[in-house]
């Protein structure tokens, strides 16, 4: 049986966003599910926009999300190979030179649209005489090259969308070599997929028409195309996600929102599938449950709130030994197991635990809360004697109710505010043993 090999091929022209990290995750998961290989390829043929900084950022983000790459390469290192295939396809008359300027092509496009015709290239360059070509050369024009698409049906089976059919006549011959001699993504990608034995390609549905074109490129090179799967796009506020829309970058979700790696990995590995989005603690468990057939054809809605809520669920589920190393990473290795278990249910992000440590072990900022001083003084006098434990709260509240008649919010909110300066937070029963008797009385009396 052929070994499964997948790839993730970002252009290093910006930071990873939620749309392309989802593609990376699903390709990685599919490869690992089938004991295969995952390749990272940088599509860096756009010399003007591709930056080494973005390559570094992409590798950093993948590492953060526990996506390990079995192989990494960039397209710039393979230019001689691309030129070899370029010459082969020119000789086979599947690549042809064109001399139109950008302005001329735009005029042609507008003209066809005005006539109700699809804006595809008219292949005028195929009818140029030697004299016309020589004139263009004398004018200083340099040719760009297009791939000649056969006017025949193109069909394939998609792992998500099922049977897909295109008519070659409805597609425009794509530019594969620019006038400056640089290669576009379209042909380079096919050459790489052939040379690196890529068996499966999972990508966004905005690439469906590219797939139709690339299938003819595979066939022109006498190769069998990989198996394709096209994911529905991630939609936020009726817009598809792109690297040019701010706030969706992985670095932002990690550093600004404070999300855990497994929150992001769990969410985007399951988003758009029929499987329940669950905060997995390890990526190995995600691999075990992954099924490409579970993904829907329908558009996928993304809301950052859902990610933040999942992060909260993940933190609640983590035992101390599972979070100890992460606490060191955020310089909070002073947090012990007892404190973690007492406050984890109230953490939206891991760094929140520092705030709760400060609240418990430094004087909280109470502000002008206009609390009932007489009530707090009376409550301090009713605090149970002896060592403060989690059971002390229930004993204390009974004493307060018997003495004052207060219950519920009227009873606990003034005490919570006096002790923590917050209207919400961890169960007071768990906070009391952390504060201890002297500090509890001190904070209640300080209000009075």
UniProtKB/Swiss-Prot annotation:
InterPro entries named in the record: aa-tRNA-synth_I_cd-bd, aa-tRNA-synth_I_codon-bd_sub2, aa-tRNA-synth_I_CS, aa_tRNA-synth_I_cd-bd_sf, Glu-tRNA-ligase_bac/mito, Glu/Gln-tRNA-synth, Glu/Gln-tRNA-synth_Ib_cat-dom, GluQ/Sye
Keyword NADP listed: no
Cellular compartments annotated: Cytoplasm
Sequence motif 'KMSKS' region, residues: 240-244
GO molecular function: ATP binding; glutamate-tRNA ligase activity; tRNA binding
Enzyme Commission no: 6.1.1.17
GO biological process, one term: glutamyl-tRNA aminoacylation
GO cellular component: cytoplasm
Keyword check for Transport: no
Alphabetized Gene3D superfamilies for the sequence: 1.10.10.350, HUPs (3.40.50.620)
UniProt: ATP binding residues: 243
Residue span of motif 'HIGH' region: 10-20
Keywords per UniProt: Aminoacyl-tRNA synthetase, ATP-binding, Cytoplasm, Ligase, Nucleotide-binding, Protein biosynthesis
Any Pfam family: Anticodon_2
The reaction(s) this protein catalyses: tRNA(Glu) + L-glutamate + ATP = L-glutamyl-tRNA(Glu) + AMP + diphosphate
Function: Catalyzes the attachment of glutamate to tRNA(Glu) in a two-step reaction: glutamate is first activated by ATP to form Glu-AMP and then transferred to the acceptor end of tRNA(Glu).
Family named by the database record: Belongs to the class-I aminoacyl-tRNA synthetase family. Glutamate--tRNA ligase type 1 subfamily.
Subunit structure and binding partners: Monomer.
Protein name: Glutamate--tRNA ligase 1
Taxonomic source organism: Rickettsia typhi (strain ATCC VR-144 / Wilmington)
Species classification: Bacteria, Pseudomonadati, Pseudomonadota, Alphaproteobacteria, Rickettsiales
Gene: gltX1
């Amino acid at each position: 049986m052929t070994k499964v090999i997948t790839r993730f091929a970002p252009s290093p022209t910006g930071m990873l966003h939620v749309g392309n990290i989802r593609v990376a995750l699903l390709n990685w998961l599919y490869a690992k599910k089938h004991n295969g290989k995952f390749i990272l390829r940088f599509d860096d043929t756009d010399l003007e926009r591709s930056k080494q900084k973005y390559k570094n950022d992409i590798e950093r983000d993948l590492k953060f999300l526990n996506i390990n790459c079995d192989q990494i390469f960039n397209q710039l290192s393979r230019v001689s190979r691309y030129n070899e295939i370029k010459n082969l396809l020119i000789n086979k008359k599947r690549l042809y030179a064109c001399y139109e300027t950008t302005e001329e092509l735009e005029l042609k496009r507008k003209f066809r649209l005005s006539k109700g015709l699809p804006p595809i290239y008219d292949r005028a360059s195929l009818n140029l005489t030697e004299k016309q070509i020589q004139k263009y050369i004398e004018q200083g024009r340099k040719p760009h090259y297009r791939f000649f698409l056969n006017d025949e049906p193109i069909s394939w089976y998609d792992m998500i969308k099922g049977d897909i059919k295109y008519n070659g006549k409805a597609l425009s011959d794509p530019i594969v070599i620019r006038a400056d001699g640089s290669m576009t993504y379209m042909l380079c990608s096919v050459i790489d997929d052939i040379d690196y034995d890529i068996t499966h390609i999972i990508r966004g549905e905005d690439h469906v028409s590219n797939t139709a074109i690339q299938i003819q490129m595979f066939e022109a090179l006498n190769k069998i195309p990989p198996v394709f799967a096209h994911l529905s796009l991630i939609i936020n506020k009726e817009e598809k996600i792109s690297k040019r829309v701010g706030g969706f970058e992985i670095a932002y979700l990690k550093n600004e929102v404070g999300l855990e790696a497994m929150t992001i990995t769990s969410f985007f590995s399951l988003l758009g599938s029929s499987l329940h989005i669950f905060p997995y603690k390890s990526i190995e468990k995600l691999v075990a449950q992954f099924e490409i057939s579970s993904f829907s054809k329908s558009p996928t809605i993304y809301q950052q709130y859902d990610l933040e809520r999942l992060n909260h669920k993940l933190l609640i589920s983590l035992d101390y030994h599972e979070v100890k190393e992460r606490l060191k990473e955020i310089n909070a290795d002073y947090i012990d197991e007892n404190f973690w278990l007492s406050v984890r249910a109230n953490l939206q992000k891991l760094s929140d635990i520092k705030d709760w440590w400060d609240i418990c072990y430094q004087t909280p900022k109470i502000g002008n809360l206009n609390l009932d001083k007489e009530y707090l003084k009376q409550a301090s006098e009713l605090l149970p004697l002896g060592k403060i434990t989690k059971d002390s709260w229930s004993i204390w509240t009974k004493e307060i109710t018997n003495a004052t008649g207060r219950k519920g919010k009227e009873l606990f909110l003034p005490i919570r505010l006096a002790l923590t300066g917050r209207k919400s937070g961890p169960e007071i029963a768990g906070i009391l043993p952390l504060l201890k008797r002297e500090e509890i009385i001190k904070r209640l009396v300080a209000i009075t």
